[in-house]
Each structure stands twice: as C-alpha cells, then as structure tokens.
C-alpha cells in the first residue's frame, strides 16, 4: 500500500499536467532538415482556446522533471510578459504572435542543434509542450532524383529533383547535368515553406533519344554563388527499338550477272534485346531469310533492287537503311517512245530510246524508215518543228560497256496537218448580175486526216447541195467576196474570191449642198443627187419636180430661190443594169408674209348694230405668228389675232382698214379695204327730224338777215347822224385755214348727212334807258333823243359755214371752221334815261 502511494501521486500530477491537452492544437512539419551553417525555418500554427499566449519557451531536447513538475533542457528562446529577449538568443527568432502563429527561425543552425525542439506554451490557465524533430548534418545532404517508371525514346518525360530543405535566409539552386554537361532544357524550380512540408524542387521536361540510354543524369545542389554543395545521379534506362546497319560485300553493291553478294545486318543497340529478324527487297519480304546475314549466289539482273533488314524487340520493329544492289548487264532490245503522237505540223516532237541496261547505255543509233539518222547518238531525239515529211517509222539501238543491244520494232510517227492549197472556184460564167444564181466549189490538194466538212463565208441566204459545193440564189448586190475552208481537225481558208456582182445604183438620195441652214426666198440653192455605189460606175442623172422633168445633171441649182420653187423633188440614177429613184425630197422655202389682203364678212356694206368680221389673209412660210391691225389713220388697233371682230358695228367704224403679218422671216402688209356702215331706219328717222328743224332755223335766220340788211341801209343813209353818235357797225370774217388731208391717208368716207348745214349764233346787247349824258358825247339837240324807229340794242351774230361733203362720223383734222362774224353797236344821243342796271342776253341756236 505504501508502495502504490508515490506512483499514484505521479499519475495524478501527470494527469493534471496533460488533462487539458485537447484544448491545444498545433500544425507544423514533423521533421526539419538542415546542415551546418545553414538556417531552419519552422512554419507553425497553434490554437489556445482559453485566451492569448502569455509565455513561450523554446527548449532543445526538453525533459520533464517530475520533482519540479517542470521541463528541463537548453533554452534556445524565451519570451516573457514584458517581451524582452536575452542577447544570447539572437540567432533564434520567434516570428509568431499570441493568437495562432508560432513560426520560428534559427540562423545559423549547428550540428548540435539536432534533436528535439520543445515549444513550451503557457496561457493564463493552460500549458502545453509541442515537440519538433530537427536533423542538422555536418555537410549539405544530397537532393533526390525521381524518374518515371519507364522511359521510351522520343517520348517526353519529367525528371524531378527534390531537396527537403528551404529557408528564406539561405538561398540555394538546383542544376541538371547530362554526362557532366549542363542540359539545354530549361528547368522549373519551386519551393515550399508550409506547415505541411518544407522542400525545394526542380522539374525538367526531357525527350530522350535511344542514344541517351545508359547516360548519367545529375542534379547538383549549389549555393547562391554557384558553389557545389551536393548532388544526386541516376543512369537513364531508355527503351528503344533495335538500331541497325547493313554491311555489303562487295562494299559498293555493284556486281555483274553470276556474281555472289553477302549482306550483314548489324544491331548496334537494342533495349530490350531483339527477338526477330527479316529481310526485304523493294518492300517485299524474302522468304526463309531470318538471320542477320543474307547470302545471294549467282545473282541475276532481276535481283537488282533495294534491300534492307528489319529487327524487332518488345518496343517495336526497326528498319535499316536501304542498300541498292546493282546487277550489271548488256542492253536489251530497245523500243522507241514518241512524246506527243500523233504530232501536229509545226509542233515539237521528242523521241526516247528505251533499253534496259546496267550500266546505262552510253551510245545510241537512230533509224528513220530503216535509214540511219546521221549525227543522232543521244538517248533522245528532239525535232523543234515537225513537218509532214517527218512522218514514218523510228527505231534505235543502245550500247554500253558490256555490249550492244538489238534494234526493236520501232514506232510510227503520224504527222497531222490542215488541208493544203485550198481554193474557191466560181462555176458560173461571168459577169454576175444582182439576182442571179451562183454556184461555187471548194477544192484542196492534200489533208491529214481527211477533210470532213467545209465552211463558207458568204452573205445572204445560201445552201450546200453537196459537200464542198455552195449555191446562192438571188445573189445580193453586196455579196462582194466569198471564201471557203476545208476542215479536218483544223480548217484551212482559201483566199476570198471576188464575185464582182453588177447592180443598179444604190441608196439614191437628194442632198442639199447649200445653204447649210434654212432656205429663205432669194437664196442660192444647190441640190445634189447622191448614191452610195454603182457597178458599173458609169451613170446618168435625171431630176423631177412633181413628175415634171427638170434636168440631167448631178446637181440642181437655183440662183435665187422663190416660193414657187418649193415642192417635191426626186432624182433618178441609172446605169447599164437598171435605174434607181430617190425618195421624194421636199424643198421648203421660207419667206416673209406676202399677198396680204383683208376680207370682210358678211361684206364691205354692213348696217350699224350688226357684226362684222375682218380676216387678214396671207401667204407665208412659216405661217404668220403675229398680226397687227391698223385703221385709216394708220393707228394701231389693240387686236393681234388673224380676225378682227366688230360687234356691234357702228357708223363710226366706217373707214379703211389694213393689216400687217409677221413671221420669223419678216413682215408684210395688206392694201386698204373699206368698210361702209350705213344707218339703220331708226337712225335715219331721227336725222330727218333734225334736218327739218335745221331748215326752219335757216328760214328764220334768212328773215332776220333781211331785217338786218334793211337796218344797215338805213344806217348808211343816216351816216351824218351816226358820225355824231357812238354807234358802230362792222363785219368780221374769220377765215380759218383748212389743211388738205394727206395724200397717203385714207379718203374721208362715210354716210352723208344733209341736215348738218350752216349754223348761226346770235347775241343781243341791250343798254338801259338813262337821261344822264355821257362824257365826250356831242351835245347837239338833234341827238338828244333817239329816232323813233331806232332801238338802243347791239346785235352780234356769227354764221358758221359747214364744210360741204363731210360726213358726220368722220372727225376733221382741224376743228376750226370758216365763219362770218357780224356785229352792230348803236347808242343814241344824250338824254335822260331811267336808272337801270345794264344786262346782256346771250342766245345760241344750234342745229
């Protein structure tokens, strides 16, 4: 019982120390590798669930002291709550934190650092010891080369060089070498510093050849300066097919018929070992030849060819290089090959002499139709331009150093050419006229192959009644030449033969020579009778106008063309074959309006109130485009159409009218035409009434005139008395000048009105009665009182004389008329008169 007590206490303490291990979790590499002087990078993570880390101690080979319940060992690193680190711990760095990172770095690392590293972690309530193995060697340890399970030639593989070391403070590099020489291929280097693994790796992609079999591949570890540290080597095991080479006796593989030949197939390399051997000639396997040696005794020319051996292993078969075995012999009977046969005349032809021989023939003899061709000693005969006489049989004989061959049967050369000397022959008697039936034949001299058809170049409609014969019915005038061709594979054309067809003149037409522009009246005009062709060329001309013969010259001339020359012209041209007429050609003469006249409808006598139409008729080319109307005073009327319509017509419209027509050539005017408008019965009645009134007025005036005459005589008898009085009597005749009408103007015409006669105007001046004497009057008693039969008045009269022969609807050129003015002024002697205002009575009588 006493013995169990201490052990039970130890178990309890151990349990208390490790009872909470489930609360700590660590991740890091189990073992780290390094060498003397290098460094160690220890990636590490942890988890403490009860709080942050308060204390961390790195032990070297820690041991638990049961007496003190603590770990003893070399303390490489120790961190306290104040974070201070002793100076002797500078080569060890804690790169972690108080949460989860526990990464460490030891630089430099020494061999005596090998062993266990203990990470003593303490939080507020928990403790933990984590162990990591460290392996430090005296010298750098070598990397390890990893190869694929199998390597075959020409198949790409990846070589891997792995080193279980990596540290940030100590750079290294891995280099690949093949047989001590750096490899040309680029390697890919990668490093890993994770909690899972720490390493440096280099991968090289490589396509090995069979020659790499057994070669040494090295992965060399170097420091940053390229200094060698360590290496690893492997020997390549490259699987490949057998590598072969043929050796021949004799070495040049050239023998004559009957000689012996030995061929040996040497295997220079095979991995794995070869299993089968076979021989082939020109791709065909030789039976019962399964060894590396091939023996051929008494060879023949048929054994000439390409030989090679084929050896197989587990990787596959391999063929050797070919060996060409030449068995020499004299030329065999020759044959001739003709290139491009049958040959076309003018083309090139090449003959080839073919004869089996070894060595090849060095001399040839050629024959044409059994006759030797001088100077032809080559294998080929070339004729650049073949001719018909080259046709025939060609043969040859070949010769080499072993002998002369035999002449073969030869080859036939067929030279083809178009028909020769083709001609076109006219079968008709000459001359040939238009409309005749013509027969022609096509002839030739020779042809190869034979003529199979004919072609013709002819105008119009034709037929070929038999092969090589042409028949043309109703030959045309323009069928000038005809040619034929005889055809086999090609056509040969004969020279065109002229038919010389005679025909009447063609394309007769009238052509205006001058003027080049429009023809105006008075121009000089020339017309030409043209035709395109005539055979025979001797011709005669005839001119016609409206069916009337004019002349027999080729030209028709007009010195001064007139409108009467206009019309339809045609010309005729004839020769000994016939005559041809032109189409009618219209000669158009342009002239100004002429023969103008004014026609009146319904006539030149029209009653007033009716309608009258005046038409301006003319002859013009081109037609009148503009009309102008004038009256008898040459006054332009506002009418510009061909017809002047007066509706209703008035007496004042009576008079002479004329018109003027204008076209693009010029102007023309008509003579005067008079329109007479007479009164209607109603107007005549009114005029008669006015005339009677006028006669009555004249009668009254005559009576008054007699009275005035008597008074005047009385006045003359009392001249003495009048000398003392202030009365005066006088006549004034106002003679107005009338101008004669223009001789070129129209005559004053119209309806005469007899009531339009003389007119008399009267004026009476009356003096008031007075007794007051006037200054300057004679104071004679005789003159104090007027005569009893005298009246103190003044009579003033004007007699207007109408112009005889005038018409009332014709306005005179001048309004002044001839008039006789008569006045009488009488004032009696001084006497008393009653005071009264003087006045004037004025009377005008119009009729």
From Swiss-Prot:
GO MF annotation terms? carbohydrate binding; CD4 receptor binding; protein phosphatase binding; sialic acid binding
Q: Cite the InterPro entries for this sequence.
A: CD80_C2-set (IPR013162), Ig-like_dom (IPR007110), Ig-like_dom_sf (IPR036179), Ig-like_fold (IPR013783), Ig_CD22 (IPR056386), Ig_sub (IPR003599), Ig_sub2 (IPR003598)
Q: Which Pfam families match?
A: C2-set_2, Ig_2, Ig_3, Ig_CD22
- Name the SUPFAM superfamilies on file: Immunoglobulin
Q: List the disulfide bonds.
A: 161-219, 265-309, 353-396, 442-484, 529-571, 616-659
Which residues does the entry place in the Cytoplasmic compartment?
Answer: 709-847
Membrane topology type: Single-pass type I membrane protein
Question: What sequence ranges are listed for the domain Ig-like C2-type?
Answer: 143-235, 242-324, 331-416, 419-500, 505-582, 593-676
Q: Name one GO cellular component term.
A: neuronal cell body membrane
| Motif interval(s): ITIM motif 1 | 760-765
Major subcellular location class: membrane
Position of sequence motif ITIM motif 3? 820-825
Keyword Membrane listed? The answer is yes
| CDD domains named in the record | IgC1_CD22_d2 (cd20938), IgC2_CD22_d3 (cd20937), IgV_CD22_d1 (cd20929)
Positions carrying Phosphotyrosine: 762, 807, 822, 842
Question: Any signal peptide, and if so, which residues?
Answer: 1-19
Annotated N-acetylneuraminate binding sites:
120
Its quaternary organisation is: Predominantly monomer of isoform CD22-beta. Also found as heterodimer of isoform CD22-beta and a shorter isoform. Interacts with PTPN6/SHP-1, LYN, SYK, PIK3R1/PIK3R2 and PLCG1 upon phosphorylation. Interacts with GRB2, INPP5D and SHC1 upon phosphorylation. May form a complex with INPP5D/SHIP, GRB2 and SHC1.
- UniProt family annotation: Belongs to the immunoglobulin superfamily. SIGLEC (sialic acid binding Ig-like lectin) family.
Q: What is this protein called?
A: B-cell receptor CD22
């Amino acid at each position: 019982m006493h013995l169990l007590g201490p052990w039970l206490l130890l178990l309890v303490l151990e349990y208390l120390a490790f009872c909470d291990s489930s609360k700590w979790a660590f991740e890091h590499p189990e073992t780290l590798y390094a060498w003397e002087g290098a460094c160690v990078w220890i990636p590490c993570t942890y988890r403490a669930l009860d709080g942050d880390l308060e204390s961390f101690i790195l032990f070297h080979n820690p041991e638990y002291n049961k007496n003190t319940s603590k770990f003893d060992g070399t303390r490489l690193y120790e961190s306290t709550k104040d974070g201070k680190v002793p100076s002797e711990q500078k080569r060890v760095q804690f790169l972690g934190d108080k949460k989860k990172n526990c990464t460490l770095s030891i630089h430099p690392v020494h061999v005596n650092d090998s062993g266990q590293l203990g990470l003593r972690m303490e939080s507020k309530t928990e403790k933990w010891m984590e162990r990591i193995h460290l392996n430090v060697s005296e010298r750098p340890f070598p990397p390890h080369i990893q190869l694929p399970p199998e390597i075959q030639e020409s198949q790409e593989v990846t070589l891997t060089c792995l080193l279980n070391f990596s540290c940030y403070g100590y750079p290294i590099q891995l280099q690949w070498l093949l047989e001590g020489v750096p490899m040309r291929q680029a390697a890919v280097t990668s490093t890993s510093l994770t909690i899972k693994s720490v390493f440096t790796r280099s991968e090289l992609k490589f396509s090995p050849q069979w020659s790499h079999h057994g070669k040494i591949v090295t992965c060399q570890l170097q420091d940053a300066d390229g200094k060698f540290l360590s290496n690893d080597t492997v020997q390549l095991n490259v699987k490949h097919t057998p590598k072969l080479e043929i050796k021949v006796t004799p070495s040049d593989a050239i023998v004559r018929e009957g000689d012996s030949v030995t061929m040996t197939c040497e295997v220079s390399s095979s991995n794995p070992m070869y299993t089968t051997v076979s021989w082939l000639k020109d791709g065909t396997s030789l039976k019962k030849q399964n060894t590396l040696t091939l023996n051929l005794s008494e060879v023949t020319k048929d054994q000439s060819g390409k030989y090679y051996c084929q050896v197989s292993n587990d990787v596959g078969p391999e063929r050797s290089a070919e060996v060409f075995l030449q068995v020499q012999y004299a030329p065999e009977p020759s044959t001739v090959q003709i290139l491009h046969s049958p040959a076309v005349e003018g083309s090139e032809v090449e003959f080839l002499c073919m004869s089996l021989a070894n060595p090849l023939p060095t001399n040839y003899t050629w024959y044409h139709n059994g006759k030797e061709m001088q100077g032809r000693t080559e294998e080929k005969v070339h004729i650049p331009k073949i001719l018909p006489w080259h046709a025939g049989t060609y043969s040859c004989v070949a010769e080499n150093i072993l002998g002369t061959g035999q002449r073969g049967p030869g080859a036939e050369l067929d030279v083809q050419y178009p028909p020769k000397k083709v001609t076109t022959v006219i079968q008709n008697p000459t001359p040939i006229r238009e409309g005749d039936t013509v027969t022609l034949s096509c002839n030739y001299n020779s042809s190869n192959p034979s003529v199979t058809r004919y072609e013709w170049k002819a105008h119009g409609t034709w037929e070929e009644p038999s092969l090589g014969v042409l028949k043309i019915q109703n030959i045309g005038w323009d069928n000038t030449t005809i040619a034929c061709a005889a055809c086999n594979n090609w056509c040969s054309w004969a020279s065109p033969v002229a038919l010389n067809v005679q025909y009447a003149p063609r394309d007769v037409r009238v052509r205006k020579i001058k003027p080049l522009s429009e023809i105006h009246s008075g121009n000089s005009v020339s017309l030409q009778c043209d035709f395109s062709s005539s055979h025979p060329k001797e011709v005669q001309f005839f001119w016609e106008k409206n069916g009337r013969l004019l002349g027999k010259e080729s030209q028709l001339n007009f010195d001064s063309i007139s409108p009467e020359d206009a019309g339809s012209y045609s010309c005729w041209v004839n020769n000994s074959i016939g005559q041809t007429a032109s189409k009618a050609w219209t000669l158009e003469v342009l002239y100004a309006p002429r023969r103008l006249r004014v026609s009146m409808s319904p006539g030149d006598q029209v009653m007033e109130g009716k309608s009258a139409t005046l038409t301006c008729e003319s002859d013009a080319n081109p037609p009148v485009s503009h009309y102008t109307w004038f009256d008898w005073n040459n006054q332009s009327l506002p009418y510009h159409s061909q017809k002047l319509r007066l509706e209703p017509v008035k007496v004042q419209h009576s008079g002479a009218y004329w018109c003027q027509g204008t076209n693009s050539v010029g102007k023309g005017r008509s003579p005067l035409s008079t329109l007479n408008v007479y009164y209607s019965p109603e107007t005549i009645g009114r005029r008669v009434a006015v005339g009677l009134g006028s006669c009555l007025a004249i009668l009254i005036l005559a009576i008054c005139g007699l009275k005035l005459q008597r008074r005047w005589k009385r006045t003359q008898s009392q001249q003495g008395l009048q000398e003392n009085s202030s009365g005066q009597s006088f006549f004034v005749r106002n003679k107005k000048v009338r101008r004669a009408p223009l001789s070129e103007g129209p005559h004053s015409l119209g309806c005469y009105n007899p009531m339009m006669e003389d007119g008399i105007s009267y004026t009476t001046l009356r003096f008031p009665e007075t007794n007051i004497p006037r200054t300057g009057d004679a104071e004679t008693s005789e003159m104090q009182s007027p005569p009893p039969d005298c009246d103190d008045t003044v009579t003033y009269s004007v007699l207007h004389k109408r112009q005889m022969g005038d018409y009332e609807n014709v306005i005179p050129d001048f309004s002044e008329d001839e008039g006789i003015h008569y006045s009488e002024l009488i004032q009696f002697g001084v006497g008393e008169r009653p005071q009264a205002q003087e006045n004037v009575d004025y009377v005008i009588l119009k009729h």
